[in-house]
A protein has these predicted regions:
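Conserved N-terminal subdomain of the carbohydrate kinase-like
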Residues: 2-92
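Short, well-structured alpha-helical segments that form the helix of a local strand-helix-strand
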Residues: 158-163, 218-233, 250-251
């Protein structure tokens, strides 16, 4: 898997894939820049009249439900239909689906139009989408929705069943990340609490996933993205003195990651 991760980064930088992102204004700037740091080329078009055309030229589509608006709720289905019709891989970030009925129902609508190759969300969001009780605190996962040794097997069973039913891959984020498909799973313990002290790191992780989806399979894309971004966060914390310098350092550390860092 480590060899796959380093190869994913190499392939991405060689291909420079165009990634069409429809996301929220809170983190859009950072999302575009992290795609560049990963080796992709972002385009953030979201007008309903142009999104289908833009998606048709992209190598991957990233949809993020944060700060959802009527305009993006009109645009996302159009892009998703286009992606599905011409086999462009899709990452859907389920931001807020555990705390907002509007977003929960809209996510279900999107998944019925065309199932994204990768669904990303925190534990509360993925539990909610799986029909389980969730305890979200706003868009954050609730403390009751935490992966532990006691519930690990039970949660894995739930998510593998859903991955098989939906024919997709799940990235469930938290202190310990889970990447789950119908027939395999992995757990990733990387990153730092400092990453939760700036806005948009979850959105950025989704964009890295989408960028890697353009060159590799969903499982490898998710594992590579979560591992590399977590390592970058750990290195950034060592070289920063607070949230401001940490944010700048996070981009630099992610951009400059080497094969030795990942190993």
């Amino acid at each position: 898997m480590i060899e796959n991760q380093t190869r994913t980064r190499q392939l991405t930088r060689a291909a420079q894939p165009l990634i069409h992102c429809i996301t929220n204004p809170i983190s859009i700037h950072d999302c575009a820049n992290i795609i560049l740091a990963a080796g992709g080329r972002p385009i953030m078009a979201e007008h309903p009249a142009e999104v289908a055309e833009i998606t048709s030229h992209a190598q991957a589509l990233a949809l993020n439900l944060g700060n959802i608006t009527d305009a993006r709720m009109e645009s996302m289905p159009k892009s998703l239909k286009t992606a599905g019709s011409i086999h462009i891989p899709v990452m859907l970030d389920l931001v807020g689906t555990a705390c907002s009925t509007l977003r929960y129902e809209f996510a279900q609508k999107l998944m019925n139009i065309h199932m994204p190759e990768l669904l990303k969300g925190n534990m509360s969001e993925l539990l909610a989408m799986s029909g389980q009780t969730a305890h979200a605190i706003g868009i954050d996962a609730g403390t009751q929705d935490t992966l532990t040794d006691a519930n690990r097997s039970h949660l894995l069973e739930i998510f593998q069943e859903k991955a098989a039913q939906w024919n997709t891959t799940l990235l469930i984020t938290g202190k310990e990340d889970m990447v789950v498909s119908a027939d395999k799973c992995t757990f990733i313990m990387r990153g730092t609490p400092a990453m939760s002290q700036i806005t948009g790191t979850g959105c950025m992780l989704g964009m890295i996933c989408a960028t890697y989806l353009a060159v590799t399979d969903p499982f490898t894309a998710a594992v590579s993205a979560a591992t590399e971004f977590g390592i970058a966060g750990e290195k950034a914390e060592k070289n920063s003195s607070g949230p401001g310098s940490f944010q700048v350092e996070l981009f630099d550390q992610f951009y400059n990651l080497t094969q030795q860092d990942i190993f």
